[in-house]
Amino acid sequence: MKYKYLPNNIKKIHHYFFTLPPDDKYIRYTMEKAMYLVDETGLAQYNTLKERGFYSNILGTSAVFSIFCDSIRFDKSTMEFTYYGRQRIERRSNILMRELVTAGQLRRVPRTENNPHGLLIVNWRTLLNKDIEQKTKSNY
């Protein structure tokens, strides 16, 4: 297996889940794409956020969420990873930076058009998601 694709798959699922503009069609599109790359643990996270009104809140407040990968720790023998990143949440009056750490494992699956590298993220979970900095935006 070529391990050079692994960080891209891990980054891609995080991009789909955590880069969210206030656009319901785009959010549905990215979540649909994400579900091809993650097992039921990803669907459970999505459903929990949806039930809590997370996506409706993004639309209602015109918040823009962006994710930035700091690093990925990967163990080739177990195919386990830990993702370290930051999320930027821009709202009308402030910008919030959050620290995000997730973990999971990659499992080989048949390649498909929707999963061209044939890697499924399993047992995906959020280990840390905390505020690290908040800035008030200047109104001119």
Predicted stretch roles:
Residues 1-4, 8, 18, 22-140:
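Structured, amphipathic secondary-structure segments that form assembly/contact surfaces
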